[in-house]
Amino acid sequence: MDKGIILLAAGGTGGHLFPAEALAHELKATGYSVHLVTDSRAERFTGKFPADEIHVVPSATIGSKNPVKLARSVWKLWTGLRAARRLIARLKPRAVVGFGGYPTVPPLLAATGMGIPSIIHEQNAVMGRANKMLASRVKAVAGGFLPEGTGAFAAKTVATGNPVRPAVLKAAGVPYAPAAGDAPFHLVVFGGSQGAQFFSKAVPQAVCRLDDALRQRLKVTQQARPEDREGVIAVYEKLGVPAEVSPFFTDMAGRIASAQLLICRSGASTVSEISVIGRPAILVPYPYALDHDQAANAAALAAKGGARVIAQVELSAERLAGILADAMSNPDALAQMAAGARQTGKPDAARLLALLVEAIASGSTVAKFKETRS
């Protein structure tokens, strides 16, 4: 049964695309055709995206104070808006769903201007700039960590959680395995879809400072940027520590599930995925985010005992080595953290968001949806 087209708008980074991918799976399973509109930067993350068609429209970030660059950005957004209008007029989607970031601005502005039911999904605990710009225009605001009943858009906010991909739900079925005694200890290090240069320096330096007995137990999976990869590999090879180092892992959910401990950033998708899978984590929020959204995301998980949060400026190699040594020597404490993480997970977020999309596409309201949701 073909229920019509739902157009998803997501781009910029994998953090915006992954929840859109999860929603796409859910919508297609219930009979919708799903199209994705994105930007050129995000195309490398769309290989497994279950869209019937993928469309690329121009977009740009408005942040520069340079008048020439600002003019170029505005022109690119205007070009994207015109392209999005043509696309929507041709597809005639039943609804348009945006997942944040400036690549969603042209499609959502076009959709709301053309009277198409529209929704934005905010993954973080703090609403991003693009979503703030769009929130007053759309019918509903779905929140990964946003609470219901507070804020300027309380009446239209639904706390759906962040949808996670089928691979994450599958990985959630793998129970946590504490590494007691001399058992191998798998450390997984990643920094979001673009890697984290800080970890490429800090983690190998910390491993250098571990006792030989601990290093002999250690196996590392680490995401590193292409320019950092060879240097990271060289350190682990010198130490005799088995390590897989790559800019991007296609099977990240499975690697998270196999970990005894994670060291990672705290983007919304990352926090949502590790909580659904249920693994202990050292979270190091990205320190340069304008809205400090990663710190807020991390705090939500730490409040349930599912993670330890450390500011990057406070995480020296010596301190990280001590944290690793303590973690490797206390498997019961890590098991408790894993349980705390799992308690915060929302594995049904994709289903709930799909129900909201269907309700708004059918002409219902957020108030009616809240009365009937299950």
Swiss-Prot record:
Task: Write out the pathway annotation from the protein's UniProt entry.
Answer: Cell wall biogenesis; peptidoglycan biosynthesis
Gene Ontology terms: biological process: carbohydrate metabolic process; cell division; cell wall organization; lipid glycosylation; peptidoglycan biosynthetic process; regulation of cell shape
Q: How does it sit in the membrane?
A: Peripheral membrane protein
Instruction: Please give the GO cellular component terms listed in this UniProt entry.
Output: plasma membrane
One Pfam family name from the record? Answer: Glyco_tran_28_C
Name its cellular compartments: Cell inner membrane
The record's GO molecular-function terms, alphabetically, read: UDP-N-acetyl-D-glucosamine:N-acetylmuramoyl-L-alanyl-D-glutamyl-meso-2,6-diaminopimelyl-D-alanyl-D-alanine-diphosphoundecaprenol 4-beta-N-acetylglucosaminlytransferase activity; undecaprenyldiphospho-muramoylpentapeptide beta-N-acetylglucosaminyltransferase activity
Q: Which of this chain's residues are annotated to bind UDP-N-acetyl-alpha-D-glucosamine?
A: 13-15, 124, 165, 193, 294
Q: Which reaction does it catalyse?
A: di-trans,octa-cis-undecaprenyl diphospho-N-acetyl-alpha-D-muramoyl-L-alanyl-D-glutamyl-meso-2,6-diaminopimeloyl-D-alanyl-D-alanine + UDP-N-acetyl-alpha-D-glucosamine = di-trans,octa-cis-undecaprenyl diphospho-[N-acetyl-alpha-D-glucosaminyl-(1->4)]-N-acetyl-alpha-D-muramoyl-L-alanyl-D-glutamyl-meso-2,6-diaminopimeloyl-D-alanyl-D-alanine + UDP + H(+)
Question: What are its E.C. numbers?
Answer: 2.4.1.227
Top enzyme class, one word, equals: transferase
UniProt keyword list: Cell cycle, Cell division, Cell inner membrane, Cell membrane, Cell shape, Cell wall biogenesis/degradation, Glycosyltransferase, Membrane, Peptidoglycan synthesis, Transferase
What is the documented function of this protein?
A: Cell wall formation. Catalyzes the transfer of a GlcNAc subunit on undecaprenyl-pyrophosphoryl-MurNAc-pentapeptide (lipid intermediate I) to form undecaprenyl-pyrophosphoryl-MurNAc-(pentapeptide)GlcNAc (lipid intermediate II).
Which HAMAP family is this protein grouped with?
Answer: MurG (MF_00033)
Q: Which family does it belong to?
A: Belongs to the glycosyltransferase 28 family. MurG subfamily.
What NCBIfam families does UniProt report for this protein, alphabetically?
murG
The name under which this protein is listed is UDP-N-acetylglucosamine--N-acetylmuramyl-(pentapeptide) pyrophosphoryl-undecaprenol N-acetylglucosamine transferase
* UniProt lineage: Bacteria, Pseudomonadati, Pseudomonadota, Alphaproteobacteria, Hyphomicrobiales
